[in-house]
Amino acid sequence: MHVLGIVGAGATTLCDRLAAQLDGRVATVESLPESATEPESTDGVAAAYGLSPDGNWVGSGDDRDLDGLLDDLSAEYDYALLSGFPDARVPTVALAGVDAANVVAEAETADAADVASLAAEIDSHEPHVTLETLVERAKADPLEVYAGAIATFTGRVRAKESEDDDPTLSLEFEKYDGVAESKMDAISEELEARDGVLRVLMHHRVGVVEDGADIVFVVVLAGHRREAFRTVEDGIDRLKDEVPIFKKETTTDEEFWVHDR
């Protein structure tokens, strides 16, 4: 799922204009004042939903942050457009010079923004991918009718390797554009040549990934569990050994590139 934020006066209007230009399922997320999100009743429920016979639904709840919401959306939507989140670590369009954390385009007003250019811009950035994104992609594969197993691996940021270690606060990953993806595609194709292996999907996140967050995913669609388990293990081992991705570690005491150690 590709994500683009828009901040400044008219951000929500520009999100609506841009959504009409995108080819795929689009979700919009609007930043609301705290008072606007207070539930109408306090019946002790954490979430409330309404569902119509034709599949339309509404919902509200508590204890949700933007990253978690994007994770939930990523398996179902091709695009997410965010209105009014200047601190989000996503590519962002700034209107009228509004400050934001990651500005990739600017416009004086929402009406002056070139939506065709923004539609191309959103596709040029790293997508937001989760394990569920890849699992749903595997289930949608034409070969899934022959599959009796889906095996997955998720790598995450480990705070410590031993009790005496300085805690790791975050890892930052960088890669050469296109090179890492090409290598992962080649590994997947080689693993898919095995008997009983139908599809292999991989994704490695880039940028800053905080302690406890997910880093890398491997998903294997296979006829049976044995080839699925073997292939998911070989897949992550080969990804770590062969794909050129550079890692910087930030602990409570220091910051360093791991390949320099």
Swiss-Prot record:
| One Pfam match | MoaE
Q: Which keywords fit this entry according to its UniProt record?
A: Isopeptide bond, Molybdenum cofactor biosynthesis, Transferase, Ubl conjugation
Return the EC number: 2.8.1.-
Changes seen on gene knockout: Cells lacking this gene do not grow anaerobically with DMSO and do not show DMSO reductase activity although dmsA transcript is present, indicating lack of maturation of the DmsA apoprotein into the MoCo-holoprotein. Their growth in the presence of oxygen is not affected. Disruption of this gene does not affect the formation of SAMP-protein conjugates.
Entry-linked Gene3D superfamilies: Molybdopterin biosynthesis MoaE subunit (3.90.1170.40)
Q: Which NCBIfam families match?
A: PRK14493.1
Signal peptide coordinates: none
One biological process term from GO is: Mo-molybdopterin cofactor biosynthetic process
Q: Which pathway is it part of?
A: Cofactor biosynthesis; molybdopterin biosynthesis
Covalent cross-link (Glycyl lysine isopeptide (Lys-Gly) (interchain with G-Cter in SAMP1)), residues: K240, K247
Name-wise, this protein is: Probable molybdopterin synthase
Q: What organism is the protein native to?
A: Haloferax volcanii (strain ATCC 29605 / DSM 3757 / JCM 8879 / NBRC 14742 / NCIMB 2012 / VKM B-1768 / DS2)
Which family does the record assign? Answer: In the C-terminal section; belongs to the MoaE family.
Q: Please name the GO terms that the record assigns under molecular function.
A: transferase activity
What is this organism's lineage?
Archaea, Methanobacteriati, Methanobacteriota, Stenosarchaea group, Halobacteria
Q: Which domain of life is it from?
A: Archaea
Q: What does this protein do?
A: Converts molybdopterin precursor Z into molybdopterin. This requires the incorporation of two sulfur atoms into precursor Z to generate a dithiolene group. The sulfur is provided by the thiocarboxylated form of SAMP1.
Membrane-crossing ranges are none
After translation, the protein is modified as follows: Sampylated at Lys-240 and Lys-247 with the archaeal ubiquitin-like proteins SAMP1 and SAMP3, which may regulate enzymatic activity.
The record lists substrate as bound by R156, V157, R158, T168, H224, R225, K240, K247, K248, E249
SUPFAM superfamilies, per database record? Molybdopterin synthase subunit MoaE (SSF54690)
